[in-house]
Amino acid sequence: RIEDFAVESIWLNKMNSEDYEKLNNFFWFFSLDLKSSKKSTQSVISNWINNNNKYNKDSWEFDITAKRIIAWLSNHQLTYEDSEKEYRSIFNHMIQKQTNHLLNEIKNSNEVENKMIGCAAIILTGLAYKNKKVYLENGLNLLKNIIKSSIDNQGFPKSRNIKQLVFYLKYIIIIREWFKESQNIIPEYIDETIYYLGSSYAFIYQNINNDIFFNGNYLSDNQEFNQYLKRFGYTFKNEVKELAGYAILRNKKIILTMDIGSSPNKDFSKDYQAGALSFE
């Protein structure tokens, strides 16, 4: 219940780092019922602001801050609607203050996943505050750079990491849906990137309905993501047998998957585990 969190003392409790991150990134807002109390939800945010208005390295950590912006703005029906004028002023100020923090720090982030989440948060702020075009312009420039530097011409991460493929596809689709919801023109390169990433996703997952355990991948449950794609009308196809250094051969009884590609560049090899000619 949101009311259980609407007490100021919750932000002063000691907890382990995992619980601290979950509490402060506010992604738990996505599990709230839309019938939850707006007043209580806004009280939770007010209490957080009272205790975290000034920068501190823990609650303002880059990834936590980016997710918090996304959670606050995505749940605007609870976090913003029917609020008092003073609250709206403070809320708007804190969103922009946190977004400025992301813009200042994103160049120092070494994790491409964090950069993508930060980039998404900056874009969302730009779409939500139409009088602040600088956020949208900067966010889209960052997105272009991430796509250019991290995704190859076939629409596969240069790391050849399958988890990253799903991550990129998920966030770029989310960004596209924000453009639709805000009735802004969707940049053509976003549609193009989704097409190629989606084609790669169809090759890896949808054609075999199973995980392949190469290059840092693990057993995953993409059922929820597949339902998300279906809900918003995204369908992808790919009939090739080889892509991005992976080969998949199958008949009615057996699926043979092979990693026949080169090792990724050292800048993208953090999670690389299997060498060339690995089989499953």
Model-derived regions: residue spans:
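Extreme N-terminal leader/anchor segments
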Residues: 1-10
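Residue-level detector of functional hotspots within protein domains
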Residues: 14, 108, 142, 233-235, ...
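Aromatic-lined, polymer-binding surfaces characteristic
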Residues: 16-194
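Carbohydrate-active enzyme catalytic cores, enriched for enzymes
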Residues: 152-280
